[in-house]
Structures are given as structure tokens and as C-alpha cells.
């Protein structure tokens, strides 16, 4: 949601944009200033006779006197608003303005009317008329009336009278807020007037009064245009208070402004719907069009925007007080219990609200207090963050909302967030072997990790040429888009012909700037030309072009993501490269946790003002060791681009087992249960290069694949933390543990076949988002396929290998798997194309306008994970892909094809077992579409890390990334 520019409304409420109410009087009366003065004095003389007849304290006369005074006053104020300086004295006041203060006209008339109103009926109507007259005078005056003391005195008298208890009415409230808004605009245009509206205390020891401010505060949480006008006007005063210590102290010490805002947020939150009507299976976050249709939520968001604007422009005293009140008066007592409701629907709603709030806030101080609440506040002995992490492993809907929340948190590029989620568990380097710690900073300059990730694409998901096979592999391998440059690795690097995460749901613009976008964007390999229609098999050249565009687009997007993360993390306090901060032998996590909670004076000031370029040293250290520096053990995979790959498969494990045994004996000597695992690892690694022969595949990729599978499928290590994301109470502190966040992500990732398609989109996007970070500890943990971890620590490569095996086993058990896979791709492409054609707004708006924090181009999840609100035409067109063909063969996932034992989608009236089996098959087929694209995305990210621009690792002349990055400690 875009931040509202509060100050830009100043001009729209200026006098020049208001339609004059007395337009029909301007031409005749302003022709002769002397005549205007004569008419003005005539009206005033008649008013004076009524005032003097009654006396200053006598009871006013009847309704005729009141009506006469009201009519004469209206005529005088109309003339006064049109008064101009005479040509002989252009800088002086006009004749009417010079006469009115001399007679104290406004104060005398107003005092008489107020006295009459106290004794009669209809006080609110007459008060509303007075407010309307003064608003007209202020808004339409052609001279600076507020610079004259008698005019300000009359206004203050009227504002003071508005504080007396009178029956409220919509007209009275509207007139008061409109007058106050006009006064705020005038004061913003002439800041020196603010001190004149600050009245001295009526008695010694009392607080001063700023009626211009105090009369607006009660309306900040009102609905409709009335509350919006108040929220538009108050930031103008807040901006002026930043340069006025007197006004700043008055607002902070002698007004209820900050408590009203905080308690108002609490009251408005209590009126929000506790359950959200989910529009479709893909729903995972609240977008602007969603909450605009909910009046209670729209009012809350308007008030939250107002708090954000106040903190942005107010005096530092007001900023600090308001932030404290929001934390202690809204987040802790309201948001904390709301996030811990027992009902799943309420948990989904509160999590979605929190994600929306974090995405909408732009002021670092307010964002910091929200993060402090998440990271440090404890509810029932658990931090809010731990509770939210545990919910990733819950049901599909709550999992999706939680993943969306963590995606928003990672988009902030805040050091404390990533420290609490991942880095504090990786800093001690307990997850790697002792001999592997120097390799943490290594950079994969030769793309071996990319080769390894691409080699994990299941055979059933690769494109196979029809029988007899056509000699097209060599030409494909020589294509410029191939991830490998060696022709010997043609079969090692599979043909990633499935639609990419970006291409499945189409891009905002074509790949090259020279191409003009058509009415509906086209994904690679799915252009609008008849040659690429679904009914025609692509030629080898078209398939090669699809591959090149597919993987090249991943590389472009990965480069943008890595560069953005490098920029955003520059002001972090440490590079997290295994040396800084230095790991300590204390119990796991104690040092890093204390680091985040240190007072500001005891911690490196990396927030406003100082910019430490420590984050750049992580990548520089790895790259500086030279291209020949490779980690000795190559246990997790062998680069497929080596021509002598088979020999390396046999040689590397022998060296790696020695390193593995040495590291285990040094680091895990006191634990039992690892001896059997090491023996099995040694046997598996020593047999990694032999493999079994297969007539369908050349020996090299099969040997590599079996060597990998023998390593990635060891017996389950002791300890329950792989099955349960959270560390159990009896788990030893010294046992390697990568944290509950990574544990629950890996556990969810390993069950990709059971997840819904939308959960997998969000899950893989979150892992890719983590992989883009430049910190060597995190980069090596996720992307270094040669890193040797402790036996009890699962690597991402092991998890992906497990998913690959499950997909291949499922494909072997499903007779019509190739047809189902093709239909799933067609459905996803058709849906993305139609949704994109109906509306280009694919995801939430950027949180702020800074170019460094612009959201990525529409990805698979961002374009598919939209509400199911497509028009009927789009829905019917998408279903064409899913309907059975005329010949009885199913074209999509809505019905089974001939020979299929199980339809993908459940049929009406089917047994629960049949429906459950259909859902299982559907999720597995969609997983087979997503998994290869995820592997290509990881491969592209690993290559992007190796080619990160050197200037990004140095001090930038343009400044750092988002303001919240390295913003300092989150504790008060």
C-alpha cells in the first residue's frame, strides 16, 4: 500500500481551490472601495445600535434582533473577505481590514451571539452558523487576516466556546473540523502564526493551551470525511512542532494526543472482523482492494497511516511517546492476545492483519517497534516470533498466511529479523565440520552448485524426445542459454523445459526492451503465434529457444535479487562470514541472542547516521582466496561439467571420508549413535562412482546421480528436531541445530508432494528469498553443495534429493503421469495468462517508494496467488484447458483420461477415500511442475552470487538500502 503524502494536500485545501460562496457579490461591490467601506460602516452601525440597546450584560432581545445581527454580520464578513489593499499602499491593509480591528468588530459581535445562545434554544445550529461564517472568512480572504490580533482573538474565543458542553450535531462537528482544517493550512503556510495560537496558561503552574490542536484530536478516529479531514490537518501541525520545542513539549506533556492515538488503534482493532471470508484457495494476504471493502478495516488502516505520518514529521518527544504508547497500549495488550487465539480462523485473521500492518508502515521508528514486539515480547513464555514460526507447519491456510508474513519480514532486510530467525544458530558454526569452517566464505566461481541443483531435476520431469530419439541434444548443449559451458555435461544438466516461475504466469514486459508488449504477455515457448499453439508439438529449435529464455530469465531475476540484498544489507553490524561475529564456545545461541538485546550504547550504531560497510567483507573474503581454493571434501555432489567426472566420483569420497571422520572425532566425541552413520556414509561414498548400469542413460550422469543419492539418503540421525521444527526440551545445547525456522521450512519443503500448489509457491519463494542474501553463513548453508555438515544437520541438498526421489517414485506408480504433468503445466499457464490479462496488479503494492525496495517482477507465486475473482469469461476460458476432449481424452486435471486409475480432481458423489486420493495425486502433479522450476531458480541464484558486481561490495555514494536495514537495536 502506497504511503499517503499528507503534506501534498495542503494546496488542495488552500483558498485558491475553494469555490467562493459570495461570487455574485464580487463584481458590483469591488468596483469602488469607497462604496464598499461606506456599506460596511452602514451595516456595522445598525449592529452597534442593537448591541448598545441591550447592553453588554443585559439579556438579548427577541429573535428579530438575532436575525438582524446575523444578516448584517454575514454581509460585513463577505465584504471583509473581498477587501484588498489600495494601489497607493499595496503592502498595507485594505480599508475594511483597517476599520474592523479598530472597532473590535468580530469579538464584539461574537461575544453578543454567544451570550444570546446560552440563554436561548438551538445552540448547536447557531454555533454551526458562526463556524461557517468564520470558515468562509478565513478561506476566502484576500489578505493575511490572521496576522491581525483582533481577528485571532475572535477565532480563539469561538474555539474556546466550542469546548463547552453543547448538544452535538453533524453540522456543528463538520463546521468545526472544516474551520480547524483551514486554520491549519494557513498556519502551515505561515509557520510564525503557530506561536500566536499557543495561549499562555490561565494561572501559574497550569499548562498552556493550543486550541487549534486540542479541538482536532477528538476527531482523528472518526469515520468518513470528517475523520479524514482531521487526520489530514493534524500532520500539518505535527510538522511545525518539529521546529518548535514549546509546541513539542505541549503535545507530549500537556495533551492526550498520543494516548488517544494508541487507545484508538486498540478500539478500532477490536471492531475488525475476527474471521476473513476467503475468496479462493490461493488467498494468502490482504490486498488494498480487500480491505477497502471492509469499513472497519479501512478505518483502522487510515488511522495507522495517520500514526505513521505523525511519527514521520513530529517533534522527537512526540515521536518517542507515540511509539511507546503504540507498543504498550496496542501491540502488547491487543495484538499479542489476538495472535494467540485458539480458533484457527481467528489466528488466520490476526496473522493476515499483522502482515498487512507491516507491509503498510514506512516510518522506521514505527516499524522498529512492531519488530521489537515480534522479536522480544513473550506471550506465555514464548516470543511472538517463535509462535509464528511454529504455525508454518500447520494446516494449509494458516501456513500460507504465515509464509506470507515471513516473506514481508524478509523484505524489510532487517538484521535483527534475520539474526533471530537463522543467523544466530549459524554463527557458532556448529552445523559444519571443523575442517569445513574456512570453506564457509568460499564462492562458487565455476557454477558447480548450479550444475548440482539442475542435476536434481527428476527424469520424469525432463523433456524426452519422441521415439525414435532425434539428435538434438548436442545442439541444445551448445546453446547460449545452457547453464554449463562444457559439452560433456549435456546429460548432467537436464533440459529444463517446464515453464519457469516467471514464465508460467507471464511477465509485465517482454524479455528485451525492443519487443513491444502485446495485449496479453506470452511466456517463453507459449507465444501467441500459431506455430506454438497447444495443439502443435514444438520443433527442437523452439524448445531450445524456450529453454534459453527460461533459464536466462531466472538468471536475470536472480541477479536483481542478489544485488538488492547486497545493497540492503550494507549497513549491518557484521558480515556473518564465520569470523565476524566470532563464534564462541559458550552454549549455543547465548552470545548471538545477547547481541540483539544489548543497549544502544553498547552496540555498534549502524542506524541513522553511521553506515558501516561490514556486509561487503563476507563475499570479498570468499572471492579473494582465488579460483583454485576449493574445499577438500566433495561429499554433497560432484560437478557434472568435469569430463573426468567418473574418476572424481571415486576419488573425492576417499578424501572426504577422512575429513569427515576427523571432524566428527573432534566435534562430536561425547555423543553416541554416530558410529553406525559414519560407517554407512563411508560405504555409500566409496560406492558412489560405481552405480548400476542403465540402457537409457549414459554412465556419467547415472553414476553422479547414484553417488548423490547414496549420500543424501542416510539413516535418520538421532534427535526429533527434524520431524518437529522446534528443539525439544531434553535436546543438548551443544547439539548442532540450525534453528526452528530453517527446520520447519525444510520439513515443509520435504513434504512438497503433500502441500497444496499455493503453499509450495510461497514456500519455494521464501527459500529463494533467503538464498539471495549475501551473508556467507547463510549462503553456504543453502547453496554450497560441497559443504560437509554435521550428520544431525540436514542440508538443503539432502531435502531436495528426498523430494526428487519421492517425485520419481510417484511418477513410477502413476501410469498416466506424463499426461497429467502436461495438463498441469497447461492449466497453470492458462490461468496465469488470463488472470494477468484481466488485471496487471499481481501482488501487494510496494511498501515504500524507495527504488531499492521495489518488489520483484511478478513471480510464479505473486501472479498465481491472487484472489479467485476472475470474470466469468476468464474462468470459462481457463476451464477449457481442464475439460475432456471430444475424443474422450482428458485435456486437464478436472477429469481422468482413459487408462488413468485415479482422476486428479474428485468427482461429485465420490467416496471420501477417492476424493482424498484425487487430492493427493493433484498435489503431487503440481509439485512435479514446481520442483524443477525451483531447482532452476536456486541454480541461477548460486551463479548470481559468484558474479555479484564488485561496486556493490564497496561503499555506495547513493546510500544504503531500506531505512529499517541496520536500524539499530529493537529494544527501547
From Swiss-Prot:
<dbReference type="GO" id="GO:0045022">
    <property type="term" value="P:early endosome to late endosome transport"/>
</dbReference>
<keyword id="KW-0813">Transport</keyword>
<feature type="region of interest" description="Disordered">
    <location>
        <begin position="573"/>
        <end position="642"/>
    </location>
</feature>
<dbReference type="InterPro" id="IPR019384">
    <property type="entry name" value="FHIP"/>
</dbReference>
<protein>
    <recommendedName>
        <fullName>FHF complex subunit HOOK-interacting protein 1B</fullName>
    </recommendedName>
</protein>
<feature type="modified residue" description="Phosphoserine">
    <location>
        <position position="523"/>
    </location>
</feature>
<comment type="subunit">
    <text>Component of the FTS/Hook/FHIP complex (FHF complex), composed of AKTIP/FTS, FHIP1B, and one or more members of the Hook family of proteins HOOK1, HOOK2, and HOOK3. The FHF complex associates with the homotypic vesicular sorting complex (the HOPS complex).</text>
</comment>
<feature type="modified residue" description="Phosphoserine">
    <location>
        <position position="529"/>
    </location>
</feature>
<feature type="compositionally biased region" description="Low complexity">
    <location>
        <begin position="523"/>
        <end position="535"/>
    </location>
</feature>
<dbReference type="Pfam" id="PF10257">
    <property type="entry name" value="RAI16-like"/>
</dbReference>
<comment type="function">
    <text>Component of the FTS/Hook/FHIP complex (FHF complex). The FHF complex may function to promote vesicle trafficking and/or fusion via the homotypic vesicular protein sorting complex (the HOPS complex). FHF complex promotes the distribution of AP-4 complex to the perinuclear area of the cell.</text>
</comment>
<dbReference type="GO" id="GO:0008333">
    <property type="term" value="P:endosome to lysosome transport"/>
</dbReference>
<dbReference type="GO" id="GO:0070695">
    <property type="term" value="C:FHF complex"/>
</dbReference>
<feature type="region of interest" description="Disordered">
    <location>
        <begin position="510"/>
        <end position="547"/>
    </location>
</feature>
<feature type="region of interest" description="Disordered">
    <location>
        <begin position="710"/>
        <end position="733"/>
    </location>
</feature>
<dbReference type="InterPro" id="IPR045669">
    <property type="entry name" value="FHIP_C"/>
</dbReference>
<dbReference type="GO" id="GO:0015031">
    <property type="term" value="P:protein transport"/>
</dbReference>
<feature type="modified residue" description="Phosphoserine">
    <location>
        <position position="897"/>
    </location>
</feature>
<dbReference type="Pfam" id="PF19314">
    <property type="entry name" value="DUF5917"/>
</dbReference>
<dbReference type="Pfam" id="PF19311">
    <property type="entry name" value="KELAA"/>
</dbReference>
<keyword id="KW-0597">Phosphoprotein</keyword>
<dbReference type="GO" id="GO:1905719">
    <property type="term" value="P:protein localization to perinuclear region of cytoplasm"/>
</dbReference>
<feature type="region of interest" description="Disordered">
    <location>
        <begin position="465"/>
        <end position="496"/>
    </location>
</feature>
<dbReference type="GO" id="GO:0007032">
    <property type="term" value="P:endosome organization"/>
</dbReference>
<keyword id="KW-0653">Protein transport</keyword>
<feature type="modified residue" description="Phosphoserine">
    <location>
        <position position="859"/>
    </location>
</feature>
<feature type="compositionally biased region" description="Gly residues">
    <location>
        <begin position="618"/>
        <end position="627"/>
    </location>
</feature>
<feature type="modified residue" description="Phosphoserine">
    <location>
        <position position="467"/>
    </location>
</feature>
<feature type="modified residue" description="Phosphoserine">
    <location>
        <position position="533"/>
    </location>
</feature>
<feature type="compositionally biased region" description="Low complexity">
    <location>
        <begin position="479"/>
        <end position="490"/>
    </location>
</feature>
<feature type="modified residue" description="Phosphoserine">
    <location>
        <position position="510"/>
    </location>
</feature>
<comment type="similarity">
    <text>Belongs to the FHIP family.</text>
</comment>
<dbReference type="GO" id="GO:0007040">
    <property type="term" value="P:lysosome organization"/>
</dbReference>
<dbReference type="InterPro" id="IPR045668">
    <property type="entry name" value="FHIP_KELAA_motif"/>
</dbReference>
Amino acid at each position: 500500500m502506497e504511503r499517503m503524502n499528507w503534506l501534498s494536500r495542503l494546496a488542495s485545501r488552500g483558498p485558491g481551490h475553494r469555490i467562493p460562496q459570495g461570487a455574485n457579490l464580487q463584481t458590483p461591490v469591488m468596483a469602488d472601495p469607497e462604496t464598499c467601506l461606506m456599506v460596511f460602516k452602514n451595516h456595522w452601525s445598525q449592529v452597534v445600535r442593537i448591541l448598545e440597546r441591550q447592553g453588554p450584560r443585559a439579556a438579548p432581545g427577541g429573535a428579530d434582533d438575532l436575525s438582524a445581527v446575523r444578516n448584517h454580520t454575514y454581509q460585513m464578513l463577505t465584504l471583509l473577505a473581498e477587501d484588498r489593499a489600495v494601489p497607493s499602499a499595496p503592502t498595507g491593509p485594505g480599508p475594511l481590514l483597517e476599520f474592523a480591528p479598530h472597532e473590535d468588530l468580530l469579538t464584539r459581535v461574537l461575544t453578543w451571539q454567544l451570550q444570546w445562545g446560552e440563554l436561548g434554544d438551538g445552540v448547536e445550529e447557531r454555533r454551526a452558523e458562526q463556524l461557517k461564517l468564520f470558515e468562509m472568512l478565513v478561506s476566502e480572504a484576500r489578505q493575511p487576516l490572521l496576522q491581525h490580533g483582533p481577528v485571532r482573538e475572535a477565532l480563539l474565543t469561538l474555539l474556546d466556546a466550542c469546548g463547552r458542553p453543547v448538544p452535538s450535531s453533524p453540522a456543528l462537528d463538520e463546521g468545526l473540523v472544516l474551520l480547524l482544517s483551514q486554520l491549519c493550512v494557513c498556519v502551515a503556510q505561515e509557520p510564525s502564526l503557530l506561536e500566536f495560537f499557543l495561549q499562555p496558561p490561565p494561572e501559574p503552574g497550569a499548562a498552556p493551551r493550543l486550541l487549534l490542536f486540542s479541538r482536532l484530536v477528538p476527531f482523528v478516529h472518526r469515520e468518513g470525511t470528517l475523520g479524514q479531514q482531521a487526520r489530514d490537518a493534524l500532520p500539518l501541525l505535527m510538522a511545525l512542532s518539529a521546529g518548535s520545542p514549546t509546541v513539542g513539549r505541549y503535545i507530549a506533556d500537556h495533551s492526550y494526543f498520543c494516548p488517544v492515538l494508541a487507545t484508538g488503534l486498540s478500539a478500532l482493532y477490536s471492531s475488525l472482523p475476527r474471521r476473513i471470508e476467503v475468496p479462493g484457495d490461493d488467498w494468502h494476504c490482504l490486498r488494498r482492494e480487500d480491505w477497502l471493502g471492509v469499513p472497519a478495516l479501512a478505518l483502522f488502516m487510515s488511522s495507522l497511516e495517520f500514526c505513521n505520518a505523525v511519527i514521520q514529521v513530529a517533534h522527537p518527544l512526540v515521536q518517542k511517546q507515540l511509539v511507546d504508547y503504540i507498543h504498550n497500549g496496542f501491540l502488547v495488550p491487543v495484538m499479542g492476545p489476538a495472535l494467540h487465539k485458539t480458533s484457527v480462523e481467528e489466528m488466520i485473521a490476526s496473522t493476515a492483519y499483522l502482515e498487512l500492518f507491516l507491509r503498510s508502515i514506512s516510518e522506521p521508528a514505527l516499524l522498529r517497534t512492531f519488530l521489537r514486539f515480534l522479536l522480544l515480547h513473550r506471550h506465555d513464555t514464548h516470543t511472538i516470533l517463535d509462535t509464528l514460526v511454529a504455525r508454518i507447519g500447520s494446516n494449509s491456510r494458516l501456513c500460507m498466511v504465515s509464509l506470507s508474513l515471513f516473506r514481508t519480514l524478509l523484505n524489510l532486510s532487517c538484521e535483527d529479523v534475520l539474526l533471530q530467525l537463522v543467523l544466530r544458530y549459524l554463527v557458532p558454526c556448529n552445523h559444519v565440520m571443523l575442517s569445513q569452517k574456512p570453506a564457509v566464505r568460499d564462492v562458487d566461481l565455476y557454477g558447480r552448485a548450479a550444475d548440482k541443483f539442475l542435476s536434481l531435476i527428476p527424469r520424469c520431469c525432463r523433456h524426452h524426445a519422441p521415439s525414435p530419439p532425434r539428435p538434438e541434444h548436442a545442439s541444445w548443449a551448445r546453446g547460449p542459454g545452457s547453464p554449463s559451458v562444457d559439452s560433456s555435461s549435456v546429460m548432467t544438466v537436464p533440459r529444463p523445459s517446464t515453464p519457469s516461475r516467471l514464465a508460467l504466469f507471464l511477465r509485465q514486459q517482454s524479455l528485451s526492451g525492443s519487443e513491444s508488449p502485446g495485449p496479453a504477455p506470452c511466456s517463453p515457448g507459449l507465444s501467441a503465434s500459431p506455430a506454438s499453439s497447444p495443439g502443435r508439438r514444438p520443433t527442437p529449435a523452439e524448445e531450445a529457444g524456450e529453454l534459453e529464455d527460461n533459464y536466462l530469465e531466472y538468471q536475470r531475476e536472480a541477479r536483481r535479487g542478489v544485488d538488492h540484498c547486497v545493497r540492503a544489507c550494507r549497513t549491518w553490524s557484521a558480515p556473518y562470514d564465520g569470523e565476524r561475529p566470532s563464534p564462541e564456545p559458550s552454549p549455543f545461541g547465548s552470545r548471538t541472542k545477547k547481541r540483539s538485546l544489548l543497549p544502544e550504547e553498547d552496540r555498534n550504531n549502524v542506524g541513522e547516521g553511521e553506515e558501516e560497510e561490514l556486509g561487503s567483507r563476507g563475499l570479498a573474503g570468499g572471492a579473494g582466496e582465488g579460483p583454485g581454493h576449493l574445499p577438500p571434501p566433495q561429499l554433497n555432489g560432484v560437478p557434472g561439467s568435469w569430463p573426468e567426472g567418473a574418476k572424481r566420483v571415486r576419488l573425492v569420497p576417499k578424501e572426504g571420508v577422512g575429513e569427515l571422520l576427523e571432524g566428527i572425532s573432534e566435534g562430536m566425541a561425547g555423543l553416541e549413535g554416530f558410529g553406525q552413520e559414519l560407517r554407512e556414509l563411508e560405504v555409500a561414498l566409496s560406492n558412489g562412482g560405481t552405480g548400476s548400469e542403465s540402457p537409457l542413460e549414459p554412465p556419467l550422469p547415472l553414476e553422479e546421480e547414484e553417488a548423490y543419492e547414496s549420500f543424501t539418503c542416510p539413516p535418520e540421525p538421532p534427535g526429533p528436531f527434524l520431524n518437529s521444527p522446534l528443539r525439544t526440551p531434553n535436546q543438548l545445547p551443544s547439539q548442532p541445530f540450525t534453528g526452528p525456522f530453517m527446520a520447519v521450512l525444510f520439513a515443509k519443503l520435504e513434504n512438497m508432494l503433500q502441500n497444496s500448489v499455493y503453499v509450495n509457491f510461497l514456500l519455494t519463494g521464501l527459500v529463494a528469498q533467503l538464498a539471495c542474501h549475501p551473508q556467507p553463513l547463510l549462503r553456504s548453508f543453502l547453496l554450497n553443495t560441497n559443504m560437509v555438515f554435521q550428520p544431525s544437520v540436514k542440508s538443503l541438498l539432502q531435502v531436495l534429493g528426498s523430494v526428487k526421489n519421492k517425485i520419481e517414485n510417484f511418477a513410477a506408480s502413476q501410469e498416466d503421469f506424463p499426461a497429467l504433468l502436461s495438463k498441469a503445466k497447461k492449466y497453470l499457464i492458462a490461468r496465469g495468462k488470463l488472470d494477468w490479462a484481466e488485471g496487471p496488479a499481481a501482488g501487494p503494492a510496494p511498501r515504500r517508494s524507495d527504488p531499492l525496495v521495489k518488489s520483484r517482477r511478478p513471480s510464479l507465486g505473486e501472479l498465481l496467488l491472487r484472489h479467485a475473482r476472475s470474470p466469468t469469461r476468464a474462468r470459462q476460458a481457463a476451464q477449457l484447458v481442464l475439460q475432456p476432449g471430444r475424443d474422450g481424452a482428458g485435456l486437464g486435471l478436472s477429469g481422468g483420461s482413459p487408462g488413468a486409475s485415479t482422476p486428479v480432481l474428485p468427482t461429485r458423489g465420490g467416496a471420501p477415500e477417492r476424493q482424498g486420493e484425487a487430492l493427493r495425486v493433484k498435489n503431487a502433479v503440481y509439485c512435479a511442475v514446481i520442483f524443477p522450476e525451483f531447482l532452476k531458480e536456486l541454480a541461477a541464484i548460486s551463479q548470481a552470487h559468484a558474479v555479484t558486481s564488485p561496486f556493490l561490495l564497496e561503499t555506495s555514494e547513493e546510500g544504503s538500502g531500506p531505512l529499517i536495514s541496520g536500524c539499530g537495536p529493537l529494544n527501547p
